[in-house]
Amino acid sequence: MSELAVIDSNNYAAMAQMTGMAYDAEGGKNKSTLARIKLQKKPIKGKAEVNGKNVTVDVVTAGSFMIEKDGKNVYAENIKIRMFLQRFMYQKYDSTVNNYVKTVMANDLDIDLKDNYGGFNCGKPSGYIQDFAALTDSMKELIRSIRRTRVVLGTVTFVDATDEKGNTEEVVDMPFVWEVDSKEGFRNFGEATNKFAKHQRLSVMHNMNVTTAEREAVGNTYYVPICEADLGTTLEVNESEQALFADFMAWVESHNRWVLSEWEQKHVKKASEEEKELAESFVDIDVEEVE
């Protein structure tokens, strides 16, 4: 691996860079084998007996967290996560192929990031856009569709976990990845991480308690994560945590290798097509010889 995947809790500055915490402290300048945390957008209904009558109830409430374990979806309204590291990327949903355009994952978003479509930043222009109103409508729409994403990797415990029928389940210290792409959720995680940074504490040394809050948009209801950094209890970093940290680092590198491979193939193809179009645009001109 290109980076030393060892947690040194006595070297905050170096570890803050490696784990991605420096992004918040400084102000925000392939198929996954990891379980993914998602938010349940709609309630899951079920039947329950109330006063001798069968009534429809919300077995799983909207806004609950969901993760897949052993082929089964598990839900909880509250979770406790231990963040080993975070990375940042851009992503955009491509409805034409029902898939995502994704960039490589980086320690921050201050540089142009190659994406798996052979471009950069999923099509977002480089640098700060000073006059958004001056852009074309198509460019505005493109930029709005691109999500700034905080990729969180760590372990999670689901509090009072159940399945979709309300049966008790157990998720304790389970490795996960979570792509937080809502604006408020992105900011909330940053605030919690910055709280650790202000106390010169690595995120892996503490838990975060996470719930969700409902938000309303035009004709739409959605949910955002609310994070609370728990500085009251310090967690030990032992050999098992070191091994898991190395696995997370390797997972990020695997994602980046895949994106770079896709970029290389599609960028070369794009360049070839552009050269062909340029060549075809030339018009042969007959030059008369002067006697």
Each model region followed by its residue ranges:
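Surface-exposed polar/charged interaction patches
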Residues: 18-21, 40, 199, 251-254, ...
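Long, highly charged low-complexity segments enriched in Glu/Asp and Lys/Arg with interspersed Ser/Thr
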Residues: 100, 105-111, 218-287, 291
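Extended serine/threonine-enriched, polar tracts that run as long, contiguous segments within proteins
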Residues: 148-234
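OB-fold ssDNA-binding interfaces and closely related basic DNA-contact patches used
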Residues: 1-168, 282-284, 288-291
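Non-transmembrane, interaction-prone segments in cytosolic or luminal domains
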Residues: 70-71, 76, 173-191, 246-260, ...
